[in-house]
């Protein structure tokens, strides 16, 4: 959708709203319960890294609050899964990545658990970050969240 006002085109872009974020967080929590991994913190941000939703499960690690938010921000900001950022920093075999300096970025998280959220056509909507379980389980939870809204992306 485009509108023209005084010769200037206004572009309409899809956004993550609170209702979509709640569906995603619910799906992540359902995956955590089904798979019985540690409780998690869930952060969902838009493309400007503004927090749309944050949810902390009972007994999720307090230090993971900040990590979940930073995973979401990292994945929205670059925008790739934080697992890819880990590979860029440390390499797939952990012998050194092609961009090791990323590790020194203050708010960047370079391990799995953050995923970008995109429309089917590839438009970036934001990202989800999950922290509290293992990195692989965090990523599994984030993937379950995105899968829950695939039909409307």
Regions found by a protein language model. Give the residues of each.
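Classical Sec-dependent N-terminal signal peptides that target proteins to the secretory pathway
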Residues: 1-2
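Flexible, solvent-exposed loop/hinge segments and secondary-structure transition points
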Residues: 5-153
């Amino acid at each position: 959708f485009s509108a023209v006002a005084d010769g200037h085109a206004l572009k309409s872009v899809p956004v993550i709203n609170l209702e979509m974020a709640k569906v995603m967080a619910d799906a992540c929590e359902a995956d955590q319960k089904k798979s019985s991994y540690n409780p998690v913190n869930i952060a969902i941000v838009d493309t400007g890294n503004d927090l749309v939703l944050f949810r902390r499960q009972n007994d999720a690690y307090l230090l993971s609050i900040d990590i979940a938010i930073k995973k979401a921000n990292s994945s929205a900001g670059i925008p790739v899964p934080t697992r890819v950022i880990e590979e860029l920093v440390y390499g797939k075999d952990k012998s050194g990545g092609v961009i090791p300096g990323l590790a020194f970025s203050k708010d960047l998280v370079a391990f799995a658990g953050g995923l970008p959220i995109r429309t089917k056509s590839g438009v970036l909507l934001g990202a989800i970050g999950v922290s509290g379980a293992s990195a692989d389980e965090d990523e599994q939870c984030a993937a379950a969240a995105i899968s829950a809204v695939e039909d409307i992306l």
